[in-house]
């Protein structure tokens, strides 16, 4: 923070580090930093913080050592939201069981990029975990890096069967992914690329009562 207006000097001081809650939800609008304001967000070196950000308490003091940790809060919250938005049902019961299926099978399609890996680390380390996670991508280098960051043998210690699959090398990706699932299909599928072929594959590998999130 470089300069603080008189109305906020009791809480903020020049030199303080901060991060933002960008989902303002101000009076029902979709306004957000980087898209909706001329002098706020994006690649600006200096910003003027709009009054609504202060009104909503969305300017947050940051006391961490690494800036990247603060910058990951928003994208990770999006992936966490996707896990929480998933739901499943039981026959004859008209209620939704929110969240991914505990002990189920999870596929993260086109998932070896930054957002997919964020979803993977959350799936591996949260309280409610699947029994199987399959991460697909077309880029072998990214898959190899993902496997080095999240070794399947480490996941196995927590009872999770972890697979990294290059669908670009498969003649029939859907058939192979279904085979990996044991023929049941997947309880939860997260699609991390806005590519028609990936979306189609995501739908095709769903199991009974499966939940598909078009994340990208």
Language-model features, listed with the residues they occupy:
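Glycine-rich beta-strand-centered segment in the early N-terminal region that forms part
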Residues: 1-24, 40-41, 60
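Generic structural signal for buried aliphatic residues
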Residues: 18-19, 106, 212
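NAD(P)H dinucleotide-binding glycine-rich loop of Rossmann-like/cofactor-binding domains
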Residues: 21-103
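Glycine-rich Rossmann-fold phosphate-binding loop(s) that bind the pyrophosphate
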Residues: 75, 110-113
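Hydrophobic/small residue at the entry helix of a nucleotide-binding pocket
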Residues: 78, 114-115, 142
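Adenosine-nucleotide cofactor-binding segment
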Residues: 102-104, 109, 120-199
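ADP-ribose/adenylate-binding Rossmann-like module
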Residues: 188, 204-216
């Amino acid at each position: 923070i470089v300069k603080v207006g008189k109305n906020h000097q009791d809480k903020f001081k020049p030199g303080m580090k901060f991060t933002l809650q960008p989902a303002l939800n101000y009076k029902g609008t979709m306004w957000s930093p980087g898209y909706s304001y001329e002098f706020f967000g994006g690649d600006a070196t200096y910003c003027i913080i709009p009054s609504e950000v202060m009104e909503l308490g969305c300017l947050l003091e940051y006391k961490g050592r690494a800036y990247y940790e603060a910058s990951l809060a928003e994208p990770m919250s999006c992936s966490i939201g996707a896990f929480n938005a998933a739901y499943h049902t039981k026959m004859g019961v008209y209620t939704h069981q929110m969240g991914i299926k505990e002990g189920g099978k999870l596929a993260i399609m086109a998932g070896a990029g930054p957002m997919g890996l964020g979803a993977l680390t959350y799936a591996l380390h949260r309280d409610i975990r699947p029994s199987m996670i399959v991460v697909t991508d077309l880029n072998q280098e990214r898959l190899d890096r993902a496997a080095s960051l999240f070794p399947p043998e480490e996941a196995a210690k927590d009872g999770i069967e972890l697979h990294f699959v290059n669908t670009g090398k498969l003649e029939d990706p859907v058939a192979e992914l279904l085979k990996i699932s044991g023929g049941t299909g997947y309880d939860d599928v997260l699609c991390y690329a806005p590519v028609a072929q990936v979306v189609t594959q995501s739908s095709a590998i769903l199991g009974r009562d499966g939940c598909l999130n078009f994340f990208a």
